[in-house]
Amino acid sequence: MILRIGKNISQFYACSTFYLDSLVCSPQGSEILMKQMLAAMKDSKPLPAPKMTKEYHYKNYPTNSITTYIEIKTPRMITEKYEKQQWQLLDSTRNISGYPCKLAVCQFRGRTYKAWYTMEIEIEEGPWKFHGLPGLIVEIADIWDHYHFTLIGMRRENIKPVCFYRTDRDDMENVSRIEYLKGSREQYKLIQKRKKRRGQTMAYDFLERDYH
C-alpha cells in the first residue's frame, strides 16, 4: 500500500492497483497487459490483477471530506465527511522503522485499533481513513490483526504533486458508504453459498463493520 501526502490532499491505494491503472493508460499498456495475462495462463500462474478490490482513498483537507473511488464490477464513488477517531493516548513506546513511537487506541466503525505514531514527523496523517494523532501513524492494526498497516519506507524528494486522478467515466455511480457496504455484503454472501456447495469456505469481513 502507498500513502501520498500533499498540501491539500492525501492519497492511499494498493501498489498493484496503481500499476495496472498506469499500464492501461499508457500507449502500449493494453497490449502489454494482454501478453502478461496470456503468459500467466500458459504457466498456470495468477493473473496480473489486484489482489483486492480496486480502491483509491482521498482525504480532501479544504473540504474536510474523504472520497473513495472503488471498483468491483462497476466503478463507484463514495464521498463522506471526516469522522474523527476518538484516540486514547497511552504511555507505551516502541521503535518502528527507526522512528520512536507512542501508542494510541480507538474504536472506529466496528473495530478496535492500536496505532503507533511518531512525533518526529508532525503530520496528523495515516493510512486509509486514519488521522488526527499528533504525528504520523507508522503502524496500525485492529485487535484481531485482520487488517495491519506498517511503514516500511518513505520518500520526500522527487515526488509528483498529489491530486485527484480523473474519474470522468460515464458508468461511474455515486453511492453512500453504508449503501455500498450492504450491497457488497450481499454479493459476498452469494459467493460464500457457491463455495459452500463445492465444499469450500470463505471467511471475510469488511474493514468497516458498522453496516449491520
Cite the ranges covered by each PLM segment.
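Generic detector of intrinsically disordered, low-complexity, polar/charged segments
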Residues: 3, 95, 129-132
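Structural motif
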Residues: 96-97, 108
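Extracellular or lumenal secretory-pathway regions
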Residues: 1-86, 90-93, 100, 114, ...
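Gly/Pro-enriched, hydrophobic low-complexity segments
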Residues: 102-164
